[in-house]
A protein has these predicted regions:
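Non-catalytic signal-transmission and effector/linker regions of two-component phosphorelay proteins
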Residues: 1-9
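Conserved acidic carboxylate
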Residues: 12
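Acidic phosphotransfer microenvironment of two-component signaling modules
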Residues: 15, 39-43, 74
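Amphipathic alpha1 helix at the N-terminus of the CheY-like receiver
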Residues: 16-27
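Acidic, metal-coordinating helix/loop segments flanking the phosphotransfer/catalytic sites
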Residues: 22, 35-55, 63
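Hydrophobic alpha-helical motif in two-component signaling modules
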Residues: 48, 57, 70-73
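Short amphipathic alpha-helix used as the core "switch/output" element in two-component signaling
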Residues: 66-80
């Protein structure tokens, strides 16, 4: 019986880093299922509405800000 995969959302605003991280998860971590990627906060919240992951890999400096990533973390804990 195959083990259930854990669901991952990757949030990164640098496209090369986003795609590289996604490829690592898809090819090197067989227990992970990337259920979505986002380059903006708005894209991230849309993904969360579609389904809550087990893991969010989040760029804390999203959009060049030093607070957006931290605010997203706080809101995840408040909502979920």
């Amino acid at each position: 019986m195959e083990a259930k995969k854990f669901k991952v959302i990757i949030v990164e605003d640098v496209k090369l880093e986003l795609k590289g991280t996604e490829e690592i998860f898809r090819h090197e971590i067989p227990d992970a299922e990337v259920i979505g990627t986002a380059m903006t906060e708005q894209e991230f919240w849309s993904l969360m509405e579609a389904g809550v992951p087990d893991l969010v890999l989040l760029d804390l400096g999203l959009g060049g800000s030093t607070t957006i990533g931290v605010d997203i973390c706080r809101n995840i804990f408040k909502r979920y």
